[in-house]
Amino acid sequence: MEMEAPHILISTVSPEKGKKIDTFYKHSKYIVKVLAPTELSEALFQYAEYFFEAAHKITEFILYAEHPDIGKLDTYFFSIAFLYRHCMELGLKAIGFQTIQDRDERKKFVKETRHNLAVILSAVEEKMSWTRPKEEMEWLRKYFADLSQKDRESDSFRYPFHIVWEPGDWECEGRFVIKNIFDEQTNIDLVKFANKFEAAYEIIRKWYKKETESAFEWKEVDPVFIETGGYYYVQSVVGYKYRRADFYPYTKAYLETANYLKWYMKNATDSGNCDYNARLFLPMCYLYRNCVELSLKTIWFEEIGEDFQIKCKLMLDNKHSIAGMWKQIKPYVLEYSRGTDEPEYIEVIEDYCMQVHKIDGDANKFRYPMSNSMQE
């Protein structure tokens, strides 16, 4: 009998001195084996399936809960959106790699299309000798065109805002400014939001598998990325002007949805089903990894009294580097901890950060089966 998921999914584990992230017990029933890819097209599609399933499981969890939780609806939206969106990107690249076999050509394809779903779709259509029926492709083009207006580079649901450079004029210098992802409060219909992702992925999956039967889910939804409204307990309310604690909903979302996947895998394994371990492990790892990055950026951006322009510049300079962000905040953390018993604890945190960075220094390890240079 399947256990009910815990209502509270906050972490109760504390860092321990000397503990290693990659330590495992060979007789444990919870061991997950991650195999090196042999063919990148197949590996990309496998990753797409993993991220799709993770998104689907988490969405089911919050939409069909016995006691709906508004807090989860308003925050888990961000990690759900990323997981669904990422499986589309992986699926499209898997289709492209079915035709693009040369390593240098694959590298060029990835570099030129980056993460923009509309651009990737267009490039794949140009290269493929087979596509889906005309009506399906037209729906997909419209949907990805609208989606890309909100999330062109796959970062709008991983971070609370964009930092952009605003050029100056003859009277003043240029400066960094915050560009909010959502400029105003938006009540998103999460059911429609998820159904559209699933409709798009149905087309992509059939395209990759070269199936001849028509997709049908797209017929039930409009090719518009976000629709507002819906029943109160299926709404995700997002979007406020920039303020302190802007990172909190994202950090909460990535931490707690990772914890949910961990709970789900453990519960399934305890029930004799180990299949979910392999399928949900990588999405779980990425959710945790992004939570660490978000937590460090929260400290840097919201807790440290540094000049705003310096904060923006150094955050951009360090991109996704956990080691880089830790290096920036460490002097401030040590300064604030003087006269307390925290310095030793800070050393433990630093060790954990360095371990995570060593495993995944650029936030790609758990998202893709290869690097941008096509190294597997």
Across the structure, where does each feature detected by a protein language model lie?
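Domain-scale activation on soluble regions of proteins
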Residues: M1-E376
